[in-house]
Amino acid sequence: MKINRVLLKFRKGLLLPRQLPNIDKIILHHACMNGSIEDVHHLHLSQGWAGIGYNYYIRVDGQVYKGRPLEYIPSHCAKNNASSIGICLEGDFRKVKPTEKQIESLKELVKYLKKTFPNIKNVYNHRDLFKTLCPVVDLKKMIQ
């Protein structure tokens, strides 16, 4: 699985470490916008966060990018951050559907993460765990 890495500078004082064996779920999101991982990172920084809240970001062309390092608690789903991995897909799924390349990359990434973290038992849409429409479409169903 090819995962692209870009240099993202985080606000270190806001990053909290976590225990990787506690990761037991994956939560799926849409970005509600088009843009690069750097664009999302800068948006989250502008909101006073440590940086991008998601662990992975999938562009419309299917390219997968590493976001917040896994050893730090992400910021993507209240009350579930410490025990989850957040994956965000580029796009506003209120207006467009995810691309086939995004869905294929998402399937591959989820499979890779489940193999890497055997305690992962469930994959959720953000809306399954928090009062939101995100990711609008049923990404969980699309990757089954």
What spans do the regions from the language model cover?
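Generic serine detector
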Residues: 36, 46, 75, 83-84, ...
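Basic/polar, cationic surfaces and motifs that engage anionic cell-wall
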Residues: 1-26, 63-64, 83, 89-144
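Short, surface-exposed glycine/acidic/tryptophan-bearing loops
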Residues: 63, 70-86
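Generic preference for flexible, low-structure residues
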Residues: 42-44, 56, 72-74, 80, ...
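Short, conserved "active-site rim" segments that organize catalytic pockets and cofactor/ligand binding
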Residues: 2-5, 9-71
